[in-house]
């Protein structure tokens, strides 16, 4: 059985995630009507590049701050929390500033040569301003997670989302519906301004929280070195995965153009799948994403105490929940594809692709649960390796199959990639759960402290 605290926190986070998902889906539907499929596709291409830069900006600091603060709190007296956070914030500011400067300097070559559309250059330059905000918010969010007060960053993210929507809607009133360059820039500017607001709110909450709970009563031991040993390996693996994923997204419109579609038709096809259908497929996943995140400290606690039976029971319960829930969601999306596509996006193409991709939901949702179990058992390196292998294989398939078979090949590659990822991850989890009980006993001490503290 899943523990009561896990169920309680899952329901709490699910409620917040559901509210934000509803707001985000409504805004995405409005954007689809306001920008059109081609405009939405142009925005998605821009976000794929800014997402890579955001990975450079964060550079593993979210988990590093969570782990480092949790280790300091593990002493029971608050340790040197403020000193640890100063290092995390400096690291975040350095990486965020560097990523922002790099994006600003390379905006033209990225827009012209990499994305292949000059209309994205202005948006890339605007997005560069938000990179320090993203990295600093990640460090602060990690602090609140370690302290067990996750409602504070959740409040900041909700305020960020609402402000971003309001600002974007206001900025779009100043651009013509057919001017995709200015429309995309307006969306990017709204997001960047909202990131700045989120940072200001989170920093105020952090200062109040730190003064209320923690003061440095002792010097931390080699805090900078400990932080870098956590952040750098995570950053390197995230760079690889994000770069491969970005290349995948950039290859799709080019491959569709090579298959015979015009530039706008290729952008429209990409925009329908990535900007309309995929958000709708992931919209109901908030329940499983919350459970998969919160099961990490639960499994680690069982692991350190050598409770092999509880590990198997907890993991099995989550996987059964994910399978039942995802099958129900898949059936509803498949049967109601025409209604949802027409009602939300006013698009027959969205309805058609939604029906084609609905059977993939059980695979995606179950993979989400399996990844949570692997991280809770200290097998996140395997999970990252599988994700990188999936992205690399998908990149090769897109390069050779998309120009020949168009959107049909793209959908087939999505199916193959998700099945490949789930198969390898599930086999690794099954092998671990079926291994000798001694294999489930000794995670590293830092992981244990982090798990216990995050689960409080």
Regions found by a protein language model. Give the residues of each.
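N-terminal membrane topogenesis motif
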Residues: 1-23, 79, 83, 218-241, ...
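Transmembrane helical elements of multi-pass membrane transporters/channels
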Residues: 9-24, 190-206, 221-294
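C-terminal transmembrane helix end/exit motif
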Residues: 170-177, 193-218, 249, 371, ...
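Membrane-water interface segments that mark the loop-to-transmembrane alpha-helix transition
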Residues: 63-108, 122, 135, 309-329
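Signature of the first transmembrane helix
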Residues: 5-63, 100, 104, 130-131, ...
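Short membrane-interface helical motifs at transmembrane helix boundaries
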Residues: 98-116, 328-346
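Helix-loop junctions and terminal segments of transmembrane helices
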Residues: 59-74, 281-305
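Short runs within selected transmembrane alpha-helices of multi-pass transporters and secretion channels
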Residues: 20, 28, 59-66, 126-145, ...
